[in-house]
């Protein structure tokens, strides 16, 4: 079979960050009765479901460590590798850091798909690493029933500039650097619903680096930051609220959306991860139309950065966004928690 004829998405049961284990199931897996090992230098661990682990070296610099891998979300091998690598590197930027090195994680059905196709996947990952200015320095591979690719990435950040998902404050405005709808558009393509003018839109967004995160970290008024991936905007926003003990008001019309997403949702192009996300986080949300839920819970692969910004810092944030070619507008606001109200209200 030629590489051109290969459709990688036919060889996996999941796609991109949409194949994440649901938050509810993950909670069960991660529960432990063992005594917790306390390391005072571990600034960010697993407690707040942040994007990466952060370790203070004690010299003003902290190391960021993360890993991310998944099954194909696109058919093209090179694009799959590039997207998976971009998505993994994003976790470093989301913590306010800069990547310094990556190693590859590859699972490949060697008796089903030719090694030359795997090479193209790795080449896509290498290309993304070069875009980030880092080496793909090694890795590990196994014979697996489905294709899997990703990276383990190491980064550094000035300790005082670490950005967490749990440090937002009431009054902060919310901003999102990429449009939503990646899961919807990729599902529409699988269902042969995607119009010609929307071809490759999702791939372009997924291949866009979140390099702006390192610059946003220089702004004191950026109180919290995370990237929006498999748990959808509402899932990751609820983690921001839970971490800081806040509530949020989200303005649906202001949320950036990929072209055509609402039309494709109406045609049933909704990935399975959407319902899993709502099953995990829906009880924290206010009422909303089904179509809104299908977009706000849509699992994103290599999605944008979600920022909580003090009003006084908005001009600085807009200047950094413009430098990176990003158009930003506020999509909501964080508020002091009030009893009897949903954690996230959608207006």
UniProtKB/Swiss-Prot annotation:
Protein residues bound to ATP: 20, 48-50, 68, 91, 139-141
Site label Important for catalytic activity, positions: 20
Top-level enzyme category: transferase
GO MF term list: ATP binding; magnesium ion binding; selenide, water dikinase activity
Cofactor: Mg(2+)
Top-rank lineage group of the source organism: Bacteria
Entry keywords, A to Z: ATP-binding, Kinase, Magnesium, Metal-binding, Nucleotide-binding, Selenium, Transferase
Active site: 17
Cofactor note: Binds 1 Mg(2+) ion per monomer.
Biological process terms in GO annotation: selenocysteine biosynthetic process
Entry's EC annotation: 2.7.9.3
InterPro entries: PurM-like_C_dom, PurM-like_C_sf, PurM-like_N, PurM-like_N_sf, SelD_I, SPS/SelD
Residues involved in Mg(2+) binding: 51, 91, 227
Assembly and interaction partners: Homodimer.
HAMAP family: SelD
Homology family: Belongs to the selenophosphate synthase 1 family. Class I subfamily.
Name this protein carries in UniProt: Selenide, water dikinase
Organism: Cronobacter sakazakii (strain ATCC BAA-894)
Lineage, top ranks: Bacteria, Pseudomonadati, Pseudomonadota, Gammaproteobacteria, Enterobacterales
């Amino acid at each position: 079979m030629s590489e051109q004829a290969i459709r990688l998405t036919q060889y996996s049961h999941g796609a991109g960050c949409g194949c994440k284990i649901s938050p509810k199931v993950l909670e069960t897996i991660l529960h432990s009765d063992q005594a917790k090992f306390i390391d005072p230098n571990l600034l960010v661990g697993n407690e707040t479901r942040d994007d990466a682990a952060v370790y203070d070296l004690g010299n003003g610099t902290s190391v960021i460590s993360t890993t991310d891998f998944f099954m194909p979300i696109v058919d093209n091998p090179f694009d799959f590798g590039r997207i998976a690598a971009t998505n993994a590197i994003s976790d470093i930027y989301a913590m306010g850091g800069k990547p310094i090195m990556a190693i590859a994680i590859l699972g490949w059905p060697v008796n089903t798909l030719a090694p030359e196709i795997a090479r193209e996947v790795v080449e896509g990952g290498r290309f993304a690493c070069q875009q980030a200015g880092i080496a793909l320095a090694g890795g590990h591979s196994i014979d697996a029933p489905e294709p899997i690719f990703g990276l383990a990435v190491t980064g550094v950040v000035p300790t005082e500039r670490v950005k967490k998902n749990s440090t937002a404050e009431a009054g902060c405005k919310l901003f999102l650097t990429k449009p939503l709808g990646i899961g919807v558009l990729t599902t529409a393509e699988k269902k042969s619903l995607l119009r010609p003018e929307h071809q490759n839109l999702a791939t372009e967004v997924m291949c866009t680096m979140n390099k702006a995160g390192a610059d946003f970290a220089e702004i004191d008024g950026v109180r919290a930051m995370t990237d929006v991936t498999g748990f959808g905007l509402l899932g990751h926003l609820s983690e921001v609220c839970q971490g800081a003990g806040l509530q949020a008001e989200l303005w649906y019309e202001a949320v950036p959306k990929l072209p055509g997403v609402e039309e494709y949702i109406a045609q049933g192009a909704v990935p399975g991860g959407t319902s899993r996300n709502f099953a995990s986080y829906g009880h924290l949300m206010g009422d909303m139309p089904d179509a809104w839920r299908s977009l706000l819970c849509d699992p994103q692969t290599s999605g944008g950065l979600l920022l909580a910004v003090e009003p006084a810092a908005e001009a600085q944030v807009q200047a950094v966004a413009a430098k990176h070619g990003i158009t930003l507008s506020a999509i909501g606001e964080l508020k002091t928690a009030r009893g009897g109200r949903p954690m996230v209200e959608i207006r």
